[in-house]
């Protein structure tokens, strides 16, 4: 298993319940054994440097996880089909 740093940005026009639902869905991918979430931060609503899909703000979320390749592939699949996510990045740690 490898360590990954993940950042994703949600559309700013979502209500808090829906933001929590999306966060829970994405985090559940890494809560199945043997994967684990090492750290997580809901950074909140921040200004974007440039417009993304006509949005100037977005809800930022950050995760540090230890996961196998299947979990990362599943995370990528979910993120790509979720329209509320406007950007994401997954970076493999140097460990």
Curated annotation (Swiss-Prot):
Keyword Ribosomal protein applies: yes
InterPro entries associated with the record: Ribosomal_bS6, Ribosomal_bS6_sf, Ribosomal_S6_plastid/chlpt, Transl_elong_EF1B/ribsomal_bS6
Keywords from the UniProt entry: Ribonucleoprotein, Ribosomal protein, RNA-binding, rRNA-binding
Any one cellular-component term (Gene Ontology): ribonucleoprotein complex
The keyword rRNA-binding appears for this protein: yes
GO-annotated molecular function: rRNA binding; structural constituent of ribosome
Superkingdom assignment: Bacteria
Gene3D superfamilies noted in UniProt: 3.30.70.60
A GO BP entry: translation
Pfam families on file: Ribosomal_S6 (PF01250)
Entries under SUPFAM superfamilies matching the protein: Ribosomal protein S6 (SSF54995)
Family: Belongs to the bacterial ribosomal protein bS6 family.
Summary of the function given for this chain in its UniProt record: Binds together with bS18 to 16S ribosomal RNA.
HAMAP family tied to this protein: Ribosomal_bS6 (MF_00360)
Protein's name in the database: Small ribosomal subunit protein bS6
UniProt organism field: Aster yellows witches'-broom phytoplasma (strain AYWB)
